[in-house]
Amino acid sequence: MLTWVDGHPQDAVPVVDRGLQYGDGLFETVLIDRGQALAWDQHLARLRRGCRALRLPEPPIAALEADRDGLCAMGPAQAVLKIILTVGGEGRGYARPQPPTWRRILSLAPALEWPLAEYRDGIRVRWCRQLWFPDPALAGIKHLNRLTQVRARAEWDDPQIAEGLIRDADGSVVGGTMSNLFVVRDGALLTPGLRHCGVAGTLRARVMAAATAQGLPVRETALSVMDCLQADELFVCNAVRGIRPIRQLGARSFAAGLVTRALQREIGPPWPAPGHGAGW
């Protein structure tokens, strides 16, 4: 793994960094294919939304792009770039230094090749006990406080279960620990609205746009457990793993249906790779 801090090769930050002390910052995880950052504009748009939500200045786009290009020039053709922006700062207490100053932490790791069976046959998913509590001001963004997902993911260690679904306090399904959820039912594509909590993934937006272009009704709405169990098709997605059908949720089995397959073909695998895509 290659790691830069503020544009220089480094793998440590000061212990007083506010990202470490308070989770005061944002992050993005970007897929790199042959040196190109996929969906870069969408990641930047969410980063900007996060800055507004946290009442922070605009992100340092030019510096981030210079860091990105420098790391990608040294790294593998297919990689995952993680961008962390923290309010560096010093001193004590919750009050931010004025004006806030950014600390840029970027790491580049080789991309993993995910099993083709996950895309062709689907994955097993479970229900999590951990709830996702509402915080509308932070809904949709990728801030550095991710204890909800950490606690949810700690609920199982069975390698055969690929994801867990988290509900809110009202019982509505928010999404997975690392992915957005889609339900196909009665010819429509449904996904949680994420107005109160959750993360609005960059691939989520692409899936919704692709479905609309294919003439499929798309609705952001509250989804219950029963809505999921009575679905015709279920799938999850994120920017690094792509679209993965759900073949089993708890005791209920599903098949990867026509809508999921059409969206997989439209969106494509996470990146072109030998053995991927041909069977979709």
Predicted regions and their residues:
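Ordered, amphipathic secondary-structure segments that act as subunit-interaction surfaces
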Residues: 74-85, 91-92
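Helix-start/capping segments and mature chain N-termini
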Residues: 1-62, 66-70, 86, 92-280
